[in-house]
Amino acid sequence: DSITFSELYYKLEADDHDNPAFIQAGNGVILSMYTRHSRKDLFINRLDATSDFTFKGAQLIHPWSDEELVRFPRMTMTYANPFRLEKENDRIYCFGRWTGFKPNMMWSDDHGQTWSDSKVFITNYPFDSNNRPYVKYFSDGQSRIHIVFTDGHPRDESTNSVYYVYYENGAFYK
């Protein structure tokens, strides 16, 4: 037995905002998704587990839409949190802090080959481009994605609350 190393991206920063997240797509391919801290880059690498266990070169994607940028005018890419839901025909969702400095979601119905435009799903009104909720995600892998989030950064919110919602079958529930 031997151990083989595979470099995801030669410029990957040593920053917890950029940590790669891994998910097995419904077709057996392993996806690695990651960002660079507060840049405009979201990367996807693919590993076909039936081959030589080497990740293919990084694919750069830009999931935001001009329409969302008009509504939420700030663009940074930080965090990548992918989840696959079996009961949604293996749809892969990816969450992160992107358009508007807010939690966004996008999805893929073809094992990560193509992606929807991202959508902001948590924001404040009136919109404040400096406010950024902190979010944690968890999924059962079947039908539900659990989401816990705050009003904003702990140092910026004098009364910072914690909220819980879950996503299931096309809707959010509290």
Predicted regions and their residues:
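Extracellular, repeat-based ectodomains that mediate carbohydrate processing or recognition
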Residues: 1-174
